[in-house]
Amino acid sequence: MYGMMTGMSLATMRAIWMMVIFLVAQMFGKSYDMPTAMGIALFFMLLCNPVRILDAGMQLSYMAIAGVSLGNYGMKRLHKKTGFRRFQKRYPLRFRVVQSLFYSVTLQGMMLPVVAKTYYEIPVYAGLLNLIVVPGMTVVVAGSWFGLLVSIGTISLGRFAMLPVGWMLQGYTWLCERTLELPWNTLVTGEIRGWQIGMWYGGIACTLVLLRTKTRNKLRDFVYKHTGRFWRKREVVRYTVCTILISMLLQGAGQALCVWQQRTEAIYFLDVGQGDGILIRSPDGRNIVIDGGSTSQSKCGTYTLLPALRSQGMTEIDCWFVTHTDEDHISGLKELLLQGKLTQIKVRTVVFSAYVFQDAALAELEAVIRAAGITIVWMREGDVIGDDTFTLTCLHPTAEYRAKDKNAASLALAYHSNTFDMLFTGDMDADAVADMDIQQDYDCIKLPHHGSKYSYVEGVYAHADYGLISCGYNNRYGHPHTEVLQGLAQEGTQILRTDEMGAVIFRSR
């Protein structure tokens, strides 16, 4: 009933399967073994749908149970020692603290690669938060049931009974929010590979094997030789601090050992729907973004830009170029800036055209940028950003060009390196494209205005191997227009579309 009421997520399904196995074991007078129950639940869930193994929620759920099982195994081995049992009986509160820390380490150890693979980051203080939040959840659940039963008689009395639970949950929320404001609250890992995950779990497996061999006797003798020191408060604090440091080292190891990011030159045309979003990692390691917004995707910054930046380990953006201030080019940027430090993304400089169209949208965005303490740079035709390895050159608008609207005043940028030659055109109209008088060959030209026929100039794209169109699937504007697609085909330019292909990536070998 609970599973049906909550939508029967895969994590809930796993819990129900394991609960059923527990009840069956009790009925037949058998002992319940958590790893066995976990294996049976996994078998039947995958039997129904093998693709479930790729679901992040399912992976996290099973790794959490694996961490608990590993903690149970460790505690059972320790409990066989007389000194440890004596410590448990004499100092139950201290024992619970040490036990909680131990389980926190095993949980983080098992879940860390999956968390990094799914979210491209590792929460540093998660283990410490669990020490505070998890023990109190017993009170929350018990209080919730009590309030539910009381509310059967009268709703008003039920609300009163639920007040302590509400206060606790509000306190947990406040604590989590304050934690997000601490320095180094997350380690952005970038996209990790299968072999890195294999190395992490292989290391855990080797550690367990090591502890089951002759070496474990020497290790245990060393540990239990100092068991008596637990009687003194000073030593309890010392062991507690050591356990916390081990937890923190696990997080650091997750970034240093398991996490590896490609540092090669790459250009990413993101699938932001009806909008533009381009990430560039230059040969010298600079992180550059051009635009970043959408009118078809809600919260484009949170759900598209931020994961993309984190997946590539881009926590610091050296330059964020804004071609013009239409919402489908700036909504994601504004969203990230308004979230502030919560995103863990630092933008050093935002670049506008010196001849950007002046309107209310520009004034609003400029105010947000200045409030975030970010430098604003105004770029003119011929201005260059880069070094010996790459250059980004402003081609448009010129000082003489008179734009009739903000699209025509879009910033046009030419990217040149030893590997790629690309042209980014914002939402330029046909007159602006013709004004640039493009003669150079490019590997790829991003078509202006999402493939609009009103921005297409015949003959321009014959200079490019690829024509990139960033647009939303089945958008209301009909982008890209048929005339544009036919023109590109006649010019021999290969068409790349984010609405059909998703994100398009150019990466040097």
Q: Positions of the model-derived regions?
A:
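Hydrophobic alpha-helical transmembrane segments in multi-pass membrane proteins
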Residues: 1-126, 192-260, 455-458, 464-466, ...
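Non-globular, low-confidence helical/coil segments that flank catalytic cores
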Residues: 82-94, 150-509
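Hydrophobic alpha-helical transmembrane segments of integral membrane proteins
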Residues: 109-110, 131, 303
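Hydrophobic alpha-helical transmembrane segments in multi-pass integral membrane proteins
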Residues: 110-116, 145, 172-182
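Non-cytosolic membrane-interface motifs at loop->transmembrane helix junctions
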Residues: 123-134, 159, 188-190
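Internal helical hairpin/lid segments
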Residues: 136-145
